Amino acid sequence: MSAEPELIQSPLSQTITRDGHSLQVDIYRLEEEIDWLLEVVNEEGTSRVWDDRFATDQAALDAAHEAIDEEGIAAFLN
């Protein structure tokens, strides 16, 4: 029986606060995978996970910032 793969959390994962609201940006991958996943979680625990995979954790973080800048933080609060 094989062990489940370890989840690798990027050191770039962070909390972003704007307009009095905080979003947790989680960037992670499975240890045997190359590409990174992006998830943004609001204060209520609701999350948005990107369908796209990212070649680097920096690319994932850039995508999170871009989405927040373009859509506004309110788009993540629902």
Predicted features and spans:
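A short, exposed loop/beta-hairpin motif centered on an aromatic-Gly-Thr core
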Residues: 45-59
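Intrinsically disordered, low-complexity regions of eukaryotic proteins
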Residues: 6, 28, 41, 53-54
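Short arginine-rich
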Residues: 66-78
